Amino acid sequence: MKVIKRNGKAEEYNCKKIKKAINFACDGLSVNPLKLEAKFDESLFDGVTTKAIQDNLILHAKNLSTPTDDEWLLVSGRLATMDGWGIVGCYDKPFINYFEEQRNNGEWSHKNFDIYTKEEVEIIGTFIVKERDLQHTIASVETAESKYLAKNECIQMLFIGNAMLYASVEKTPQSRLLRVKEFYEELSNLEWSLASPQLMNLRKGLNNASCFILAPYDDLNSIYDAFKDAAQISKNGGGLGWYLGFIRAKGSSLMGTDGGSGGVLPQVKVLNDTLVYINQAGKRKGAGTVALPIWHNDIMDFFDIQTEVGDPRSKSFDIQPQVCFMDLFMQKLEDNPQQEWITVCPHEVKEKLGIVLPNMYNEDFVEAYSEIEKAVEDGVLKVFTKYKVIDLWRKYLQVFFEKGRPYAGFMCKVNRDNPNKHDGFIYCLNLCVESFSNTKPDVYHHTCSLASLVVGRIAVNELSNKASSLTRLLNNGMMITKAPVVESENHLRDYRTIGVGIQGLADILAREWKSYEDLDFITEVCERIQYGCVRESIQMAKEYSPYPKFKGSRWDVGDIFDEYHKNSVCPDLDWLEQKQLCKQYGIYNSQLTSPAPNTSTSLFMMASAGFMPHYAEYFYEDNKDGKTPVSSMYGKDNPIFYANSVGYFKQHELTKAVGAGQKFVDTGISAEYVLDRNIHEVTAKDVSMLVKEAWKNGTKAVYYLRTIKVGEQLVKTDELCSSCSG
């Protein structure tokens, strides 16, 4: 029987080659190679290509996998990896040769590669452990090939290339090489998970920031400058947040004409279509969220931007809405939902009362709202609507239940905890609701780079050290990349916001035989990570300088350290010592931690996604090649934990876990919730309780809601979160 090789030549079929490949892929695993041989023999025929042989081996190994025999996913991944090795040939030559080829062909075009001498590159080549490619399952390999690997790359080359760039800013050749090895070891051992923009863009010298928030003024130039910036950000792979709270309401005066304003919905439509047109570097859909505060007079129309109600021309189906809730509204809802709530136009309130309502939170908002109530009663304000609190709440719940959105942001809590409230305001949440900081129209666009600790592979007592190193990596990355627009450059310069996250909280809970009810343990995980980040950021301030807006911040005043000391569950961590060091040296970053959903990168890292419970012990991921099985990190060791997947939880109870972690997260936590009608009866009361309990339990946001109908299954998708954090 003849087989056709990749070069088109025919040769006799050699079964020994196939058996050798199968045995290599099965080596050290608890699988029987004969099972794969038997399956494979059924697909042989005269004239079969070697590519078809390899594809069939990969497919059959994948299909042999079951929840109790999931090591076949590793066999399939190894076979796919070996196939990639043969095609790319990156390990068949000295690393210095490979490095020069990637530089010459433009795949590794970042200018900081030039910092390394030939001798240093040769030393770096000795760090590479080719065999670590073989620890990736088929879902991991497919994710890498479809999203992250550049031309002629294998996984270890991706890791070493990024490690070289992150280390390139170190001050001496010796320290550079030490950092390259350190960063490479963490990445290749799958203890760190970089965000998608860093995996895709860094080696080419493109943007590697994940999250952006824009807040245009109610001014034509400001709005259209922001549209242009949004296009640039999307082009460069960023996920977008857009605050609408400055924009005058529908029916407000415009250029002296009463009732001339069209309100916020036309602006949302333009942004929606901009993000559809300008996708993310051609690899992913453009993605963004638009935010409107609950006090804005367009709020009822905003609720319907993705429903079937109203004018089709006002709809925006490709963007994610969010509502910014104030504590006063939530408290009225709690105390007496029949109370009145007045929505107004921010432009009119500013013109007639001198109140910039988007800048009002907590007690300031309560005072401003009292003035607004009086102005309405006195007939000063013309553009307003009176609602019962319960009517607005019911409308929100109806849309949230049907569509899973709008997101909910609890903006008084967000601004109360803001480390930089001395210098501005946080207006809304980012696309995945975990990263936000001060934004100033036409001056600052919130900009943040993210990466996560794969906590299921890290010992609890090592979390702080790993977080310190990852903080260094993200800060080094900030130094070597150019943000896509000037306002982002301004933000990076003055605030230096990064977001160290948590990938696979479920996995560390499973490994340690804990549960989502073990709130102190969840707090401990977050505290140890925050401590490591803060410690390294203070050290970097000592080496370089504090972030420019440090003076007057909560870090400078020290109350944030007092709060950490008060909430601490780790006796071995000395927050008061860090407070003294910060007083002496300052801190390099304004904000440090942001647990993101990281669904896409979790496939690459073979970990549960983000902070919330896993989807299932064993599930199927949809991709261009069909459905690929995905198993759990500790499914064999602790199957009972993974059997209790996200749908089994009372979702309002999960908000306690998020609140427990939030005590030691200085921005937000991306938390999506699932109501599974196959497991629990679901009522409007359940949805209401979920959002209210999230507010009461000290969380800052509710990401989206998934409602699973009877007879349906939870389908895993990464469309939203892979748009920024990955």
Question: Residue locations for each model-derived region?
Answer:
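Secondary-structure capping and boundary motifs in well-ordered enzyme cores
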Residues: 10, 49, 154, 179, ...
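Conserved catalytic alpha/beta cores of large enzymes that bind or transform nucleotide phosphates
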Residues: 261-269, 276-284, 289-390, 406, ...
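Function-dense linear segments that define catalytic or interfacial modules
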Residues: 150, 158, 162-176, 180-256, ...
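Catalytic alpha/beta core of large soluble enzyme barrels
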Residues: 120-140, 144, 433-440, 474, ...
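Short, surface-exposed, low-complexity cationic segments
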Residues: 14-31, 161-167, 609-614
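Terminal amphipathic helices with adjacent charged low-complexity linkers/tails
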Residues: 72-106, 325, 414-441, 498, ...
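Core nucleic-acid recognition elements
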Residues: 9, 31-170, 178-184
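Internal maturation/activation junctions in enzymes
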Residues: 469-489, 513-598, 669-670
